[in-house]
């Protein structure tokens, strides 16, 4: 399958105006240490930050307005060396003159007071400076989860209510959402898994675009089946035949350029779908 076919498959079913606000991917960045063979952890986290920027820029170019990103959970905070490396990678590479950043609104969610209490006062001030800071043209919003936990979220539901409904969790290297569940915001959320990490050097713009379109297409085709779906007899028979009796699964080969081979696994109505490129 060509990227143009995937684009047509996804976007022919919708108008961007209809879903520009309601399609909100949740980017769960991961794999920067184990995937950074050949360069330091610091370079790995920098690569993760650059992937985040590129993903957001492409998402915005496609016409969408918001995304949610997990930086690190509160559980990660126990590893001081790791946290210090993550924070350094962010502050050293955050450029408020960057056109995409300059035209974005940042909203921060998590226990940021712990940074001040544990010797990271400069980073604490950095987060305060960017949180809800008016931008030149607030046509894209980043919802940033940092030092986040479900326990913090339950105690701060008023803040959590500012996060939009999550359409798709995009998880890298690991097939679970650990420490990153967002209460009341994940009622119709699909799950997308990338086998390779969110390391910028591993991804072309074309492959990031494919990741976004796969997430969009799966969300559109499955969200009506979550919780409130009423099945007619023909639907029951068709799904039962394909999913239960045939154990249906699909593999789609994408003809796109990418520095690394990858497998993206999604879950359709009839079974898993593996996109390989």
Predicted regions located by residue number:
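Flexible, compositionally biased loop and terminal segments
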Residues: 1-277
